[in-house]
Amino acid sequence: MTIDIFCDVIDNFGDAGVCWRLASIFSCEHGFPVKLYINDAETLSKITAGLDPKKLPCLVQGVEIHDWKDAETSEPSQVVIETFGCRLPIAFEHKIAAARPQPIWINLEYLSAEDWVEGCHSLPSPHPSLNVNKYYFFPGVTKKTGGLMIEKDLFIRQERFAKDRNKFLESFNLDPALFTVFVFCYPGAPLAEFYKALRQRGKEINLLLPKGAATDILSKLYEEHPSRNIQFGVSKMVPQSEFDKFLWASDSLIIRGEDSFVRAQLSGKPFIWNIYPQTEETHIKKLEAFGERICPYYGESYQTWIDMNLSWNKSSRDLTCCWERWCHELPLMKEAAQHWRDHLVSLGSLADNLLSFVKSKI
């Protein structure tokens, strides 16, 4: 089976990260020839080892990476996956419609836990002017969706990393014995309030951070208001394959976007989701919908989880108080996060579920 994946990079690294992870799974785990068409190879190169964005097309880890424009003169593969509703080149769409047999055309959508997703998952959508269907495929956290991307060796790698955790944190001059929080959020997050909460609590803590605007804000706050109880460990940007180690090394996570949101859930660690802000507070509705899904798994600690997440994204509650409760109930949330991960694993990997769906349409 041959596969084309189209990636229109719009927001930071999230779009590229999701597409690269899917392409890698299809290539490395299933052995399928995969072409990834992308409009911003420069962004992809920052999270993909061995990719020179100036030398396209190229083969990286078994995946053929092409400039988006290459599709205009290419023939479709047996499966064509457009991600997040990106519009394919018109000439390529015509080739899909004319091919015999027609390729299976998939629109891989954004992850959402909202109720309506279950009713739209796997539905066909006729092209407005061509005689061809494409199918909506939704990642999700219920049995009636496509699940999440889970590599076959993910948990083996996490288990192996446990013995290297201390050395990993020490490489950032952090004390492995201290409570460690990984912070990967948008610059608009309530970082001043968070820093204030850490100072007021007074207990020693490690902050593990990737380089970026949010890290610069926290560093400036530290310069203005030094605090002996807060230790910083700042990392340069790393390949996607190394990102999980930062989650595994931490006790609690603050993450953003979609790909890191999924990886946080699969790490089995309590997390705060800095969801991408949208107009009319649409993002808050998405956050609350996700909260309803995990509520049965978090039980007694759920109110603490949702209050902290709403505080982070809406600034409608006292963050200092929420953080104190978060730290107090961390043991309960750790157990809940692992139960939630077990549930996600039971849904199967998105890549496997997508392949099963494709085979049912051939």
Language-model features: locations:
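A donor-sugar binding/catalytic signature common to diverse glycosyltransferases
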Residues: 13, 20-24, 237-286
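C-terminal amphipathic helix plus adjacent low-complexity
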Residues: 296-362
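Extreme N-terminal starter segment of soluble prokaryotic enzymes
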Residues: 1-4
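Donor-nucleotide binding loops and adjacent catalytic segments primarily
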Residues: 167, 174-244
